[in-house]
Amino acid sequence: ALLYEGAALAVLVVLLFLRNARATFVAATALPLAVIPTFMVMHLMGFTINVVTLLSLSLVVGVLVDDAIVEIENIMRHLEMGKTPYQAAMEAADEIGLAVIATTFTLISVFLPTAFMVGVAGKFFVQFGWTAAIAVFFSLVVARMLTPMMSAYILKPRVSRGLPRWIEIYLG
């Protein structure tokens, strides 16, 4: 239930941030596309779905959507510049690619060492570290391969609408 709640909140925040249902759909699609292969690799490694692996997935659910959000936000910026969806997706993905890759491998380097802890705690954290690292890696694969492609076909050209009135009031 915690995984579903985290996913629903992540999608809601994306919708509020991007204010575009199509872009939210692309970002929301990234979540299952990263989690399903994670479950497959967990099965190959002999892991079960337990409290530790679900905790790991619950912690990284925001990260799983984050890579796609970064890509989509940059694509939306290019769309507001008047580019076609295909052109915006390709140029935005090229612009932001290295940053997304660097962020992902930084997160992997944070989570993966927990898989190599020794002792009693290490027995529990093996599945935690591997599950988090694998999920974050598949998030990168989805963000770099599928998000730009889906954006090129699903998003529509748009003009900049500016900030919502309540944000302008808040910022002064």
Task: Give the role of each language-model region.
Residues 1-172:
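Hydrophobic regular secondary-structure detector
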